[in-house]
A protein has these predicted regions:
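Phosphate-binding loop that captures ATP/GTP phosphates
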Residues: 1-50, 65, 192, 200
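Structural and coupling elements of P-loop NTPases
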Residues: 18-23, 97, 116-118, 128, ...
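Residue-level signature of catalytic and energy-coupling elements of molecular machines
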Residues: 44, 68, 86, 126, ...
Length: 248
C-alpha cells in the first residue's frame, strides 16, 4: 500500500467477492515517451486488513495458504492483462501454494522473475529459488540484478576532510576553479561488487535469461516513499527492465 500511495485504504466485500483497491496511473506512450492512456491497477494486500500498519501477522502455514487462495479465487479482479504476485524471499509455504494454485492456469508466457542483489550471501538464497522453479517446472522469465551500483553527479557528492568535517563547498569550488569539466560528469560506485560474476553469471549457470541491472536510484526510493511511480523530472530506471520482461 505504501508504494502505491494507498495507505489507509480498505478492501470491501461485494456479491462478486472482495473488491481490490484501485490506483489510477498514466502509462507512458511507447512511441513518443510522453503520457499515454490511463491504466487501472488493482491492488490486494494483507496490509489493507490489519488494524495498524505496525501490526504483525503471526500466522502458521495453513492460515497463510488460505489467504493466498482467497486472494486468487475470491477477489473480483475483473478482466486482467497481467497478474503480478510479489512474494517474500526464499522458498516457503507461500511459493508452494502459489505454484499449486496457479499451476493449471499458467500459460507459455507466464513465469517468475527472480530478483537478486550481486553479493554472494544474497545469491546463495536466490540459487535455491531458481532450483525451486526447476523442480516445480515453473518457467523463469529471467533474473534481474538489483542495487547494481550507484551513479551520482559530481555536483551531488559530499566531501569530508581528513578529520571527518564537511568539505563539500571547498571541494566543489576547487573543482570549478581548476577542472570545471569534471562538474558535468557522474561518479559510478560499485556499492556491492558482484561476486563470481554476479547475477548474470548465476543466470547463465541455470540457463535462464539475464534481464538486466537496476542501479541504486535515490529518486526511485523517494518516489516509493511518496507512493509515486517516479518523481517528476527523474529518469525511469525500471522502464528498460519492464520492456525486456514484456518481450519474454
Amino acid at each position: 500500500p505504501q508504494m502505491f500511495g494507498l495507505r489507509g485504504q480498505a478492501v470491501h466485500r461485494a456479491a462478486s467477492g472482495w473488491s481490490p483497491v484501485y490506483v489510477q496511473q498514466v502509462a507512458a506512450d511507447p512511441q513518443t515517451g510522453g503520457e499515454g492512456e490511463d491504466v487501472e491497477l488493482g491492488v490486494m494486500s494483507v496490509g489493507f486488513m490489519t488494524p495498524s500498519d505496525d501490526d504483525a501477522l503471526i500466522w502458521r502455514g495453513p492460515r497463510k495458504n488460505g489467504l493466498i487462495k482467497q486472494f486468487l479465487a475470491d477477489v473480483d479482479w475483473g478482466e486482467l492483462d497481467f497478474l503480478l504476485v510479489d512474494t517474500p524471499p526464499g522458498t516457503s509455504d507461500e511459493h508452494i501454494s502459489l505454484v499449486q494454485l496457479l499451476g493449471k492456469t499458467l500459460g507459455p508466457d507466464d513465469g517468475a522473475v527472480i530478483v537478486s542483489t550481486p553479493q554472494e550471501v544474497a545469491m546463495l538464497d536466490v540459487r535455491k529459488e531458481l532450483s525451486f522453479c526447476v523442480k516445480t517446472k515453473l518457467r523463469v522469465l529471467g533474473v534481474v540484478e538489483n542495487m547494481a551500483g550507484l551513479t551520482v553527479p559530481v555536483t551531488g557528492l559530499g566531501f569530508r576532510d581528513g578529520t571527518g568535517n564537511d568539505a563539500t563547498e571547498q571541494a566543489i569550488s576547487m573543482i570549478r576553479e581548476r577542472c570545471p569539466e569534471l562538474l558535468s560528469l557522474s561518479a559510478c560506485l560499485d556499492i556491492f561488487p558482484p561476486a563470481n560474476g554476479g547475477a548474470q553469471a548465476m543466470a547463465e549457470s541455470f540457463g535462464v535469461p539475464f534481464i538486466g541491472r537496476v542501479p541504486i536510484e535515490p529518486a526511485l526510493a523517494r518516489a516509493c516513499e511518496a507512493g509515486l511511480r517516479a518523481l517528476p523530472g527523474s529518469s525511469d530506471v525500471m522502464a528498460p527492465i519492464v520492456e525486456r520482461i514484456l518481450r519474454q
